[in-house]
Amino acid sequence: MRKHFKGAKLCFALSLSICLTLCGCEKKETKREIKAEYTLEQLREESKNFKAEYPNLDLSKTKIIIPDGDNIEELIFPVDINIGESEENFEKVKNNVYENIRLLTGKDKVEEKYVKYSACEKEVLLKDVTKEDRMISLIGTPEHKEREKERNIDPEESKSAYGFMIGYSDGDYSTLLWGSSFMCEFTNKRVSGTWKKKYYEAGHRPPDDNIVRSIDISKDSIDDVSYVLDGKEVPLKNAIEYVEENIGKTGYHYAASPFLTYEVIHVDVIKYGGDKYYYAMELKALYKGIPFSSDMYAAGYPLEGEVDYEIFSETHHVSMLAENSMDFIWSSANNYEEKKEGEVYDKFLSIDDAMYLVSNAVSSSTTLHCDRVELLYRTEFHKDSTYYCIKEVQCHPVYQVRCVNTGLPDYPVLFFNVDAITGMVEGMDTLI
């Protein structure tokens, strides 16, 4: 299983100037006693007039966000989609995908000629394999070992088989499920007219190379934003309301979770096919009003020690090519169908303690400008050690600190996650 280490990895990927900026290259001792002893109500009060100062952090323009409520539940979501485990599990996942296909196409019967199975073993992609080949490719049978020998694959290495794909594409509709990242896509290609390629010829997503307007929902007004979609004027505000209300009501497996709500955070208006437009929306997931980490650059690694899980940040994507129509859905790791009970926390580190820990992880020779500090959920992949498929996703409360105007050309934005219970500090995945 993948392990994440502190400074050696962090320093390896950075230029010397960046290495000198972050911890792992400059060791500091934490002298303050850190305890999780503050209620959410106390944190909300602390956030109102936060005036603490740190030698290497500029908080003059920092927005601090603390959720409502009295506690935060640690979330545990089983993800039972490892089709390499057994024939029974394979059939369960296959049946769910076939239900999706029937719902997507509106047909009672799935046309098998349009269904494809693929497997990934490390960087080896097996295309167009049968169900039997699929099982052999993931289970350590004699046939599997013989195939490894023929393809010159180390048997020990191939145990890290991490991906599978079940896909469908008939030219009008396509859908696929990836096991390695618990990602599912649904595409209705009929709307655009100019966009009718099979998945295996590429083009399974709407064309996105002509963005005419990019909108940050948290900052930009959308009151007057309106474009013609498939011959009809559709105000963006109406489109967003429809998607947020209906993304969880599609009936598809792996498209959204009944335990979560979703909010649009970004929209690109895209022109395609000459003079046609559509809305490409990015959504974040929330549990009882508390958001999941949604910035792809905010995934991290502990700056001290190691862990046996993978930290990640994910969003949903929905494209609307016609009014009240979700013509492309991309979901990944925020689409759980089951939930287990987790620990409920009602005491947390103070905001001051969290920022102190970040300051302690940053070189005293630099100053980082923090524009946002938010108490939210950080998500973790827990993967099977044999097939490297996701077995469980855990969501844990952290302070996420975003730093802007870093002065680093390749990294204008930096993120730190501070565990709101233990104080463990994580640095950015993109720096590793």
Language-model segments: which ranges?
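Short low-polarity hydrophobic stretches
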Residues: 100, 399-401, 423
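A short, surface-exposed interaction/processing loop segment used at functional sites
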Residues: 171-172, 176-219, 227, 311-344, ...
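Preferential activation on post-signal-peptide N-terminal prodomains/segments
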Residues: 25-307
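Sec-dependent N-terminal signal peptides of Gram-positive bacterial secreted proteins and lipoproteins
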Residues: 4-28
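Segments that shape or occlude catalytic/ligand-binding pockets
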Residues: 228, 238-409
